Amino acid sequence: MGLLVGDDLWAVVIFTAIFLLLVDLVHRRQRWTACYPPGPVPFPGLGNLLQVDFENIPYSFYKLQNRYGNVFSLQMAWKPVVVVNGLKAVRELLVTYGEDTSDRPLMPIYNHIGYGHKSKGVILAPYGPEWREQRRFSVSTLRDFGLGKKSLEQWVTEEAGHLCDAFTKEAEHPFNPSPLLSKAVSNVIASLIYARRFEYEDPFFNRMLKTLKESLGEDTGFVGEVLNAIPMLLHIPGLPDKAFPKLNSFIALVNKMLIEHDLTWDPAQPPRDLTDAFLAEVEKAKGNPESSFNDKNLRIVVIDLFMAGMVTTSTTLSWALLLMILHPDVQRRVHQEIDEVIGHVRHPEMADQARMPYTNAVIHEVQRFADIVPTNLPHMTSRDIKFQDFFIPKGTTLIPNLSSVLKDETVWEKPLRFYPEHFLDAQGHFVKHEAFMPFSAGRRSCLGEPLARMELFLFFTCLLQRFSFSVPDGQPRPSDYGIYTMPVTPEPYQLCAVAR
C-alpha cells in the first residue's frame, strides 16, 4: 500500500509538472510570432521574474532597452508585459494609442482590501464607464472645493505658515524634514477629503502617516509581482495579511476616519468636503446597479486620493530640500529671485510664478531628476494593436517607462545630473519640455496635477523665503541616489535650517 501511495504521489507530481509546462507554453506562445517585441528568454513558470532587479527596476529596464530597443517584452510568471521607452514611443503609446492602451491589468493583491465589482476607485479602475464616472466626480468635486481657485491657494499658504513655524522649532539642531513635509501636504489633502486639519503633534495623525510610510513598497516589490502573476497563492490562508501588514493597518485607520465622518454627515446641508459629496451621490444612486457610487467604493476613492496626493508631493519636496543643500549655488539663486520678486514681508502667491523663471525651473528639475514614479502605473491593451511595427495582443500589460523619458539622453543636456538650466533658454526664460512627464500623459495622467503644482511652488517658495538650508557640520554629504519604492524616496538625511 505504501508503494502504491508513492506511485500515486509521483504520478500527481509528474502530471502537475506537465500541466504547468503546458500552461506556460500557452502563455508564451505569442512570443513565437515575428512581430512580437523582443526580450530576454523567460524561465519556465517564473518567466523573467528573476531577471529583473525589483530594488532598481529603472536600471534593469535601462540595460534591457540598450539590448532590445525602445519596445521590449517580459514574461512575469504567466503575465505578458511590454515595456515602452523613450519620449517618442511613450507619448505615442499614451496619447496617440490612448483609447486602446488606457486599461489597467488585474491586480488581485488588492482584492483583500476591498477592490471588487463597482468598487475599484479611480487609479486602478478599468478604463470604462466606472472610471469615467469616478474621475469626472473627483475632478469636478475638487474644483468645487477650491482646486485652481484663490480659496485653496489661501489654504495652502496658511498650511505653509504652519510648516515654517514647525521648521523654526527645529532650527536649533539638525533634523530630518520629511515627516514635517508629509504632515503639511497631508493636511491639504485632509482639508479637501475630510474638511479638517490635524495638529502636527496629533497622535492619530502621526500614527496614520507612520503606517502609510511603512506600507510603501509592500505592494510593488517582488512579492507583490509574484502574487499578481500567480493569484492562486492569495488563497493560502493568512498570506495576504502577512504580505501586506502595514497596508492593511493604514486602511483600517482610513476606515476609522470615514466612520467618524459619516456620523457627522447631514444630507440636508451643503457638502463640507469630497466625502460628503460622495455620500450624497451614494444616496442618489440607490437602486441603480450600474452606478459606482457605494460605500465600498468611497473607501477606495479616498485611499486613492489620499495616498496619491500626499505621498508624491511630500516626497518631491523632500527631494527639493535635499538638492538645495547639495547645490548651495542653486539655493542662492533661488533666494535672490525670491528677494527680488516677493521680498521678506508678504507671502508667496501663485501669481508670482510667472515672474520667477529660475525658481520655476528648479522645481521642474527637481521633479525630473528625482523621477519618483519611474515606471508609472501599468496600463493594459483593451484590443490588439500594431505599435512601432510590433503586434501587441489584447490583454497585454504595458509599462510606460517614464524614467526613460525624464532621463532621455537625446533630449536632456545632462540627463543624470541636477541641472535647472534644462528648463531655461539662453535669455533665462522658463521653457517647458515635451519630455517633462512626471505626471504621465494621456487619459490616465494624474488628476491631481494642478494641486501638486500649486503645493510644490507655494511650499518650496515659502520655505526658501524663510530659511537657508545646509548640510549639518560634521555630517557626511548626503547621497542623491534614491531608494526604489513607490514612490522613489531620498535616502534618510538631515539638514540645518537657519532663519533668513
From Swiss-Prot:
It is found in: Endoplasmic reticulum membrane; Microsome membrane. Heme binds at C446. PROSITE patterns: CYTOCHROME_P450 (PS00086). Its EC number is 1.14.14.1. GO terms for molecular function: heme binding; iron ion binding; oxidoreductase activity, acting on paired donors, with incorporation or reduction of molecular oxygen, reduced flavin or flavoprotein as one donor, and incorporation of one atom of oxygen. CDD domains: CYP2D. Its cofactor is heme. Keywords: Endoplasmic reticulum, Heme, Iron, Membrane, Metal-binding, Microsome, Monooxygenase, Oxidoreductase, Phosphoprotein. Induction: P450 can be induced to high levels in liver and other tissues by various foreign compounds, including drugs, pesticides, and carcinogens. Its main location: endoplasmic reticulum. SUPFAM superfamilies: Cytochrome P450. The modification Phosphoserine is found at S249. The keyword Methyltransferase does not apply. Belongs to the cytochrome P450 family. PANTHER family: CYTOCHROME P450 2D26, CYTOCHROME P450 508A4-RELATED. This is Cytochrome P450 2D26. The lineage of its organism: Eukaryota, Metazoa, Chordata, Craniata, Vertebrata.
